[in-house]
Amino acid sequence: MSATTSGTASAAELAKFSAMADAWWDPEGDFKPLHKFNPVRIAFLRDHFAAHFGRDIEAPRPFEGLSLLDIGCGGGLLCEPFARLGFAVTGIDAAERNIGTASVHAERAGLPLTYRCAMPEDLVAEGKTFDAVLTMEVVEHVADVRLFLDSVGQLCRPGGAVGAATLNRTLKSLALAKVGAEYVLRWLPRGTHDWRKFMKPSELTAGLREAGLSVDAIAGMTFDPFSGTWSQTTDVSVNYMLFATRAAA
């Protein structure tokens, strides 16, 4: 790896998240915000995947027979729930320590997950494809957004679907997600995010379209400081999620 980047990975971002690897599964640790809004992310993705693939979410393992790739999986906070829902899950991350953390936790949980220290373009080069691809809270950390999104598109099979989430680049997100979360509330370590790398929904939609995908749904996430909970909203001015699909062959 060079001093700054390798493919879509940024060396500075890798160092930052590697240093926090052991905290992934601590609900009160560095990744507390992810634990807090994980149920909202899972519900959004589960419901849209079920509608797209024609699956019954009331079934014990509704996505049995389908494969899912989680890009930038970190410690596996999304991989494990989707494995329990029946997906054959592969999680990749450019930080080796994250993969170690995720693998140990999955083994302890008795879940048959596949984890690899790799970047999406590595899997593209191997000719891998998946029914579902996730890139949740990742695109704002990559070095080459265009290459990254192109890889996401290539990894999604015809007839497949992609779930994406990031932060909007607005003054509100600067105040809340950057200054508020990192410096005032100290939910995140200082320097976790670079506001300049946040993406507007129109920018992410355009990038996914160029990668051969069609955005079918968008939703925001909002935090209620009184209840301490997150919920889905139509307001996409800070955190937002997208659901995109690739046309069947």
Curated annotation (Swiss-Prot):
Signal peptide: none annotated. GO terms for biological process: methylation. Keywords: Methyltransferase, S-adenosyl-L-methionine, Transferase, Ubiquinone biosynthesis. Belongs to the methyltransferase superfamily. UbiG/COQ3 family. Pathway: Cofactor biosynthesis; ubiquinone biosynthesis. S-adenosyl-L-methionine binds at residues 41, 72, 93, 136. Its EC number is 2.1.1.222, 2.1.1.64. It comes from Rhodospirillum rubrum (strain ATCC 11170 / ATH 1.1.1 / DSM 467 / LMG 4362 / NCIMB 8255 / S1). Pfam families: Methyltransf_23. O-methyltransferase that catalyzes the 2 O-methylation steps in the ubiquinone biosynthetic pathway. It comes from the Bacteria. The keyword Transferase applies. GO terms for molecular function: 2-polyprenyl-6-hydroxyphenol methylase activity; 3-demethylubiquinol 3-O-methyltransferase activity; polyprenyldihydroxybenzoate methyltransferase activity. The lineage of its organism: Bacteria, Pseudomonadati, Pseudomonadota, Alphaproteobacteria, Rhodospirillales. This is Ubiquinone biosynthesis O-methyltransferase. It catalyses: a 3-demethylubiquinol + S-adenosyl-L-methionine = a ubiquinol + S-adenosyl-L-homocysteine + H(+); a 3-(all-trans-polyprenyl)benzene-1,2-diol + S-adenosyl-L-methionine = a 2-methoxy-6-(all-trans-polyprenyl)phenol + S-adenosyl-L-homocysteine + H(+).
